[in-house]
Amino acid sequence: MEKFRVIGSTQPLQGEVTISGAKNAALPILFASILAEEPVEVANVPHLRDIDTTMELLERLGAKVERNGSVHVDAGPINQYCAPYDLVKTMRASIWALGPLVARFGQGQVSLPGGCAIGARPVDLHIHGLEQLGATITLEDGYVKAHVDGRLQGAHIVMDKVSVGATITIMCAATLAEGTTVLDNAAREPEIVDTAMFLNKLGAKISGAGTDSITIEGVERLGGGKHAVVPDRIETGTFLVAAAVSRGKIVCRNTHAHLLEAVLAKLEEAGAEIECGEDWISLDMTGRELKAVTVRTAPHPGFPTDMQAQFTLLNMMAKGGGVITETIFENRFMHVPELKRMGAKAEIEGNTVICGDVDRLSGAQVMATDLRASASLVIAGCIAKGETIVDRIYHIDRGYERIEDKLSALGANIERFRD
């Protein structure tokens, strides 16, 4: 099993890093390509395990998939309608295959998905949305099966709970429905906006993406087109936090400040100097005092849950007691016991973690438990005294492209090895 060996240093991380395309936009866009009867080209797709799995899944369905810089998908030849367990078990995002399959072909089935073990992420909202569009859904032998005679039908859907995943499922399925769908209490994340932009380039008629009310006028077919995936705001935030806790200075390229305004505001509150350009963000923490901040995760445009673990580490290294409250997912403080193994001070009370400050962490053997938690452990290793071994780094490979190379370019001492 692969691991990271990180040798900590008191030297600040400095330099430039190029941000990859957003996994959380690339995945739904690749699944949405199932809807297209003509070839599509998707640029700025990160090289990640989940992307590779998605491409393999599309090929299993019968699509022609090729990667030479951009990802090219021809979903015209699709003749299979089942996302099998052997692929789906590793990736929760595979549920996004269901809506496009039933919308275009009238049938689809997806094995109940896997992914990060960070609490309840039920597929009920996906299922209920497809049912409201006229699909018949059954659960059999561990598979979610969807069927419709003819086309799905447009509907007015009010989501019981704000859900990024279900918003994407319903929006994609409704593009080929007969009539107009209005989706209220929709999620507003930038990745939803990006998916809608992609679909509109193929001939969909979607308006309101990025607000809590999305309108989709159904069309009979989608054609081909080209699209570049939006930059990864979570990767951007992760590297900015890495620079902040190391008292460094970095520039993130190929990213946009409007994607992570809540994160930038908290970094400034923590004492960082932030500057932004059209496609770059810089952070300077040189000679500045890191101050603890109070964070409460919330749906976009609030503070993203995917940055919670990184800010937990920031608060542990900052002056003053920081409090972080997680409102999106349960069981998302699994990084805290691992950081405490490195000497961090923190107490978990329900959905809140209260951090105390320490002068410096100490290297230790730690275990990654989910994607974002693993990033916080790697950053902790960069600033700790001595050697840190991060185990189960397959989690980090699901969401960060070449993180060890990018950190090394900033001055970190990190290597991947297999024992």
Swiss-Prot record:
GO MF term set: UDP-N-acetylglucosamine 1-carboxyvinyltransferase activity
Alphabetized UniProt keyword annotations: Cell cycle, Cell division, Cell shape, Cell wall biogenesis/degradation, Cytoplasm, Peptidoglycan synthesis, Pyruvate, Transferase
Enzyme class, spelled out: transferase
NCBIfam families for the chain: murA (TIGR01072), PRK09369.1 (NF006873)
Subcellular location: Cytoplasm
Family: Belongs to the EPSP synthase family. MurA subfamily.
Enzyme Commission number: 2.5.1.7
Pathway it works in: Cell wall biogenesis; peptidoglycan biosynthesis
Record's keyword annotation contains Transferase: yes
UniProt-recorded name of the protein: UDP-N-acetylglucosamine 1-carboxyvinyltransferase
Active site (catalytic residues): 116
One cellular component term from this protein's GO annotations in UniProt: cytoplasm
Superkingdom of this protein's organism: Bacteria
Role: Cell wall formation. Adds enolpyruvyl to UDP-N-acetylglucosamine.
List of residues binding phosphoenolpyruvate: 23-24
Record-linked SUPFAM superfamilies: EPT/RTPC-like
Modified residues (2-(S-cysteinyl)pyruvic acid O-phosphothioketal): 116
Taxonomic lineage of the native organism: Bacteria, Pseudomonadati, Pseudomonadota, Gammaproteobacteria, Vibrionales
GO biological process, one term: cell wall organization
Catalytic activity from the UniProt record: phosphoenolpyruvate + UDP-N-acetyl-alpha-D-glucosamine = UDP-N-acetyl-3-O-(1-carboxyvinyl)-alpha-D-glucosamine + phosphate
Binding, UDP-N-acetyl-alpha-D-glucosamine: 92, 121-125, 161-165, 306, 328
